[in-house]
Amino acid sequence: MSYFDINDILAEEQKITCNFFYDAYNLGQLEEGSRDPDMKKGSKVDLPYWMALALAKSNFVSVIMPPEYQDEYKNKLIADPNVISMRLFPYYDKIGVQLSDFFGDRKLKLLLFRVFRERFLNIYSQSINLKETDISKILGNLTYQEREVFSNGYKSSNDYDKWMSRKGEKVEKNTNNLLISTSSNNKNNSSNSSNNNSNNNNNNNNNNNNNNNNNNNNNNNNSNSNSNSNSNSSNGNNNNNSQNSSYKNTQSTTVKKRKRMFDDE
């Protein structure tokens, strides 16, 4: 069971007859028409299923199988499940499964499965074949699970008939949607192409900037090499000049020495 499912909550509110094993103080209000504030031992009280199950597990009460799950009613279901009205037992199958687990009654569980299977086929067949009819009386004789089966089949059948009767209109609408989607795709493609062109232009500009940077670097390298060569040549010239001057000084010194020697003689 789901905690937030309204049908599960209502199913657990179904009344089940219980027999108290002990005196229960301050629980007399549970018994309808009783003025005694306490519940006497042996009292039979109709309690909600959730309360009866909790008290039975604690051995405070014994649960009495409801009449609709006893042999008389079960024999009617076995004879012809489709003619039985479930107006008074909207949660017959759900509570029946839980009671079969509580009492360990496997035969009851098998009977519930068989009844649901046979009624399901008849209910589904009616739901897809009934057209433009009042279904409130049919739904009133079903359990809440059977109502869901019938409602889903009935709605699906009517939706299919409406779709078949307006098939041309549906195709036209789909064509318009196709044209709209095509135009939107073209717009998207054009915008994408413009974005690609702008990206290509940006890439070209970046390449040009890189080329300019490379040219500037080459020019700088050439200027540096020229300056280095000029400085080297100037250094070489300076060295040559210094060598020439030293050679001249040496020659002049030699001439002076020889002149002195001649003068001394």
Curated annotation (Swiss-Prot):
Location within or outside the cell: Nucleus
Pfam families: PSF3_N, Sld5
GO terms, biological process: DNA replication; mitotic DNA replication initiation
Coiled coil (UniProt feature): none
Low complexity compositional bias, start-end: 183-246
Amino acid composition bias (Basic residues), ranges on this chain: 255-265
Taxonomy, superkingdom: Eukaryota
Keywords, sorted A to Z: DNA replication, Nucleus
Segments traversing the membrane: none
CDD domains in UniProt: GINS_A_psf3, GINS_B_Psf3
One of the record's GO cellular component terms: GINS complex
Family the UniProt entry places it in: Belongs to the GINS3/PSF3 family.
Role, per record: The GINS complex plays an essential role in the initiation of DNA replication.
Protein name as it appears in the record: Probable DNA replication complex GINS protein PSF3
